[in-house]
Amino acid sequence: MFRTLKQPGAWVITLAAAGILMVTMGARQSLGLFVSPLDSSTGLGVVAISLAMAVGQFAWGAIQPLAGAVADRYGPGRVLFGGLLLLALGSAMTPFMDSTSGLIVSLGLFSAIGSGAGSFSVLIGASSQRLPLAARAAASGVINAGGSFGQFVFAPLLQALIQLFGWMAAMWSLAAITLAATPLVRVLAKPLAPPPPQAVADVGLWHSVQAAVGDRSYQLLNLGFFSCGFHIAFLVTHLPGEVALCGLPSAVASWALAIIGLANVFGSLYAGSCVARYRSKYVLFWMYASRALMIVFYLLAPKTDLTFYVFAAGLGFTWLATVPPTAAIVGKLFGVRYLGTLFGMTLLAHQIGGFFGAYLGGLALTRFGDYGWMWYADIALAAAAALVNLPIREAALPHAAG
């Protein structure tokens, strides 16, 4: 798998993108650790905080097509640099917010838009445009693993900071770490080499978007990714609450999130390898089907520390490993010239699901006292996602660019 990255500069580009994603995704995927401290500090309630987090899920996805389009048109450097600055600003502002609207601004808008601008659509799009075809699948897996490794590092780190110094200091530390990642942007800001003369003529961004929106395979891919966003956002936001309902210490939640991240490092690398060998739609089918089975296992198992850790490892293996095969299908259908934009649109579908997963989780807890109905919805959506991927066509359209 890694042999394809031995070409000059391939590892530098790949690791720079992975490093940026480690910070932006590590920050986003660990926000659930702040729900209880925010509730205790502000008295706003879980529903209000869940709403701010849900707005953040949607904003993170909504910025993806726009950030991808700007990066495709003008280059990724300014987009990534601005995103990191905005993420740092949102994190630094949050301790000063004591209202629902304030949290929506800091966490739901600034932090979410900033991390979204420094996330998959821009990073995978920029790296794919700068790497040869043979290296793209492996690079996608490594970049995705960087995001998962961020969750593995950030979850226990932020939990320790919360316990030792309080949640406000943890937020300010997050802002400082984000700023420290800005030098990596320079690697991806370098201009693209001119395309070879025999390359397919560029049909333009708008024409590519129109073709994607009307393509049945692209529509089915987005439906599956909606389900992915639903349960990832639900777990990221409400896993600490589920752990508390089971009478277990908060450290179980932070370590479960860390295990999810660590397992997905291996899952992402394996997904990148599978994309290079098998049809991506079958990779996605088995990933989504396994999630439904893992949730059934969790519901039937006794609620102990070990159960949460096994559940986290099993679910974590496919957590964000859906990104390489999903991005690969978009690239196969439409080429890589506007991959940042078109994959960004797919990520928007993911985060619309994320909005419902984060918000409905808080609503279910308030209304029913537990997350039972959310788990059942999660099983149904994961099974549906597995099935809708099977009819997808993995063949380039005639006008695919790049």
Question: Which functions belong to the PLM regions below?
Answer:
Residues 90, 102-118, 226, 307-321:
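Hydrophobic core of transmembrane alpha-helices in multi-pass small-molecule transporters
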Residues 187-207, 398-402:
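Flexible cytoplasmic inter-helical loops of multi-pass small-molecule transporters
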Residues 85-98, 290-303:
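C-terminal ends and interior cores of transmembrane alpha-helices
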Residues 63-75, 268-279, 365-366:
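Helix-to-loop junctions at the C-terminal end of transmembrane segments
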Residues 31-35, 216-268:
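Extracytoplasmic gate region of multi-pass secondary transporters
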Residues 29, 57-65, 152, 261-269, ...:
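Residue-level signature of mid-helix packing/kink "hotspots" within the transmembrane helices
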Residues 143-190:
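Helix-loop-helix hairpin linking two adjacent transmembrane segments in secondary transporters
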Residues 107-145, 335:
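Cytoplasmic helix-loop-helix junction between adjacent transmembrane helices
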